[in-house]
Amino acid sequence: MFSASSLLAVIALAISSVSAAGPSAVPLGTAGNYVILASTGVSTVPQSVITGAVGVSPGTAASLTGFSLILSGTGTFSTSSQVTGQLTGADYGTPTPSILTTAIGDMGTAYINAATRSGPDFLEIYTGALGGTTLLPGLYKWTSSVGASADFTISGTSTDTWIFQIDGTLDVATGKQITLVGGAQAKNIIWVVAGAVNIEVGAKFEGTILAKTAVTFKTGSSLNGRILAQTSVALQSATIVEK
């Protein structure tokens, strides 16, 4: 017969042994050192608020627009009143170019890893109309565009994971938001999008965006996560917080 202390120990072990739900994590490599990373450019319409580092390559400092860059004494990075971290481009001093080249390569590898996962748990669910839905942990696949014309929820624990594979565009309507419940964390959510990503005015988004093309966050919109884009990122007085 179990003593009270033994029973509690068994319960604790059972709880600790529960596996996280959802697909295995997508390795970001050194791309994970950036809150925004892009190939051709990053623009802002001031004032945006960005927590983390911003990088562009093979784009140069000239493709970091709207930031009022202040070049460091070493010439290896710049700063901006809109960004808590460093801003870097491919024409900065050594070793910045090689660091960025590696990060861009890691971004491409992460995109392929996420986009080519097979055997989705949810295929074409809600025909891509996410407004009003609740999304549980898992691998999701849409062969067309995805949008949210109303708020929606992502529900799971702090260790659960989500990968959303979208072959078309991703659009979130004005003022709509994602709510995380049950302990779900933005760092465990991956959106891998082949088409353009457009987050409208005042919308609130969660997760890492791995984008094949361009990403736009409009006035008053926000992101808890990262933007890793293989072309450009445009911010219009947006708030981007690294998660």
UniProtKB/Swiss-Prot annotation:
Its induction, per UniProt? By low temperatures, 0 degrees Celsius.
Name the domain of life this protein comes from. Eukaryota
Q: Which residues form the signal peptide?
A: 1-20
Q: Cite the InterPro entries for this sequence.
A: Ice-bd_prot
- Alphabetized Pfam families for the sequence: Ice_binding
In this UniProt entry, which residues are annotated as the site Ice-binding? N198
Annotated disulfide bonds: none
Which UniProt keywords are listed? Signal
In the record, the note on similarity to other proteins reads: Belongs to the ice-binding protein family.
| Biological role | Binds to the surface of ice crystals. Has low thermal hysteresis (TH) activity, which is the ability to lower the freezing point of an aqueous solution below its melting point. The TH activity of this protein is approximately 0.3 degrees Celsius at 11 mM.
- Protein name, UniProt field: Ice-binding protein K3-B1
Q: Which gene is this protein's source?
A: K3-B1
